[in-house]
From Swiss-Prot:
Catalytic activity: dTDP-beta-L-rhamnose + NADP(+) = dTDP-4-dehydro-beta-L-rhamnose + NADPH + H(+)
Binding locations of dTDP-beta-L-rhamnose: 100-101, 149
Any Pfam family the entry gives: RmlD_sub_bind
Site feature Could provide a fine-tuning to achieve optimal pKa matching between active site and substrate, where: 100
One GO-annotated biological process of the protein: polysaccharide biosynthetic process
Protein name (Swiss-Prot/TrEMBL): dTDP-4-dehydrorhamnose reductase
EC code: 1.1.1.133
Keywords linked to the UniProt accession: Carbohydrate metabolism, Magnesium, Metal-binding, NAD, NADP, Oxidoreductase, Plasmid
Entry cofactors: Mg(2+)
TM helices/strands, residue ranges: none
Amino acid sequence: MRLAVTGKNGQIALALKAQARPDVEILTLGRPNFDLACRSTVASSIRDAAPDIIVSLAAYTAVDKAESEPYEAFAVNRDGVQALAEAAAGLGVPVIHLSTDYVFDGAKPVPYCEEDRTGPISVYGRSKLEGEFAVASANPNHTILRTSWVYSRYGQNFVKKMLRLADTNDELNVVADQLGCPTSADDISVAVMTIARRMLSSSSADLRGIFHLSGSGEASWAAFAKYVFSVYDEITGRQIKVHDISAAEYPTPARRPANSRLHCDKLERTFGIRLPNWEESTRRLVWALLLEGKDA
């Protein structure tokens, strides 16, 4: 199986490369030779890669910065993704596209299903939703995976930020009134491989469309931080106090949904995939980062 993976330096792309089996060839695409904001590079890069399937991970992910750079966000998350999906369709290649929980407004009191009405409240969320529309219209042979609160040993993410802050702080204020599903990039990569194999082995329409893919369980940012620091305490013997605060007490340029929990039963029914509990995957990562030094 030959995968072309965009966003070569992102968390999920790096996790895919790290976990690839010998029978899987992963071609990672990224700047400067491949840039979603430059449509002219997209089609030629995909044609040269000659993949069996494309995993679309590249995105403009600076949620707050997008509020002042909407053109740049839409150029990548909508227009670039459309060019990618069109190129794939021209070659008869299926696309797995990663989207986000931020396509929802957060007003629903329970986890969101795939069929629920979207209503993004940030430029980033709107650009990602438009990207979903672009993929669906350009290439019917697609699977869109909405995920959330991604963390890993790679790049910048919440777990690594908390551990960095622990170096110089004994107490931290963390938002407690936003709920979501922390999701390990390693777990996502395993799921993506399974989905790719199924898509290549079957043309069933049931395997196409939108699916929610997130870690089992739920947490607020504060609860997430407290769990990270509970594992940190086990390893180091040092306690970090987390104080719950409201989102209003921690203003940011972009609004975040108060609830972006994702209901993932459709994914399990269709592909037999249910990701591990987020606490299990978080514990494994914190131990790796602190004891094994597997940082990137």
